[in-house]
C-alpha cells in the first residue's frame, strides 16, 4: 500500500525555475522531474499515442520505484467513444508491455458529451488485460450512479475521483487502488489556481483513510499554471509525512 503523488505532465516551460534549472533542455526534464517525484501522469498520449520504443525509453530513463500513469488516446475515447476498441487496445498493450515495472494506471477519460452506456463500457473493460490497471474519468453527469460503480468494481476498474470547476467530487473507490485528478480549486476555470493548505490537509486525511483500507492511491495535480501543480504536490506529500 502506497500513496503516489505527482503532476499531470512534466514538460512545461513555465515550470522554470520552480522545478527545472535555467537552461535545462526539454529532453532532460523527465529525469529531473523524477528526482523530485515518484510518479507522473503522461497526458500527451491523449493527442498522439507513443510508439512502443518511446515507452521503452521511459522505462530505461526512469529510476526504480517510479510509476508512470498514461492517458488513453482520444482516438479511442473521444472519436470512437470506446466502440470496437480492439485495435486501440493492441496498441496500448504494446506500449504498456514496454513500460514494464514503471507502469502505474491507464487513465480512460470519456468525452463530456458521452452519456452513460453501461454495455459499451463493460465491453471495453472486459477486453482490457488483467495486468493493466484502469481508471475511468467520467465527464457526463449520467455516469455518476451506483450501477456504474458496481460495473467498475466487477471489472476491477477505478472510478476517477475529480476535483475541479463544475466537476462532482465523488469519493467512491471501486478497485484496490484509488485514482484522483486535481484539476484546480478555481470555481470558474479548470486547471487554474493553487489549493490552499487547508484543502490539501483534507485530502491528506482522505489518502490516509484509503491507505488504511488497503488501497494504493495515485493522485495527480493538473493545475499546471504558474507551477501550482508542483507546489501543491510537494505540500501534500509533506502533509502526509506529518
Predicted features along the sequence, with ranges:
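Residues lining hydrophobic/aromatic ligand-binding pockets adjacent to catalytic sites
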Residues: 1-242
